[in-house]
């Protein structure tokens, strides 16, 4: 599993399409094994969704996201947890622990974490 978070100086970037950097979390056995920062190749929701798919992202944690971006992520098979703010590392840890509070999610279940 690979989690992506729009990243801004340790916190989740407020708007998905405003992000300059994504923090990626590679997960093995429900634990973060590796993280890295990657710079997207564009700003539109379709470009960002395709970029994340190219990075083999399976799950996105973010704050604000448009319905069009939600559709683009769904088209690429990327699960979405939206309405999350604060520390990127803390939200990723909460997702893995099953305690993440998102205002919107496309996740069907968490059995594959």
Describe the role of every protein-language-model region:
Residues 1-40:
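N-terminal first-folded block
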Residues 67-112:
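C-terminal structural segments of small proteins and small subunits
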Residues 43, 65-67:
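Short Gly/Pro-enriched loop/turn and capping motifs at secondary-structure junctions
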Residues 7, 63-64, 84-85:
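Short secondary-structure boundary segments
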């Amino acid at each position: 599993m690979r989690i992506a978070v729009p990243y801004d100086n340790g916190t989740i970037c407020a708007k998905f399409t405003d992000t300059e950097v994504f923090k990626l979390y590679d997960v093995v056995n429900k634990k973060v094994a590796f993280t890295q920062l990657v710079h997207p190749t564009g700003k539109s929701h379709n470009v960002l969704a395709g970029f994340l798919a190219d990075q083999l992202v399976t799950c996105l944690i973010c704050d604000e996201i448009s319905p069009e971006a939600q559709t683009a992520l769904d088209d690429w098979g990327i699960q979405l947890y939206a309405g999350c703010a604060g520390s990127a590392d803390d939200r990723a840890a909460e997702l893995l622990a099953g305690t993440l509070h998102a205002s919107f999610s496309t996740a069907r279940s968490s059995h594959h974490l």
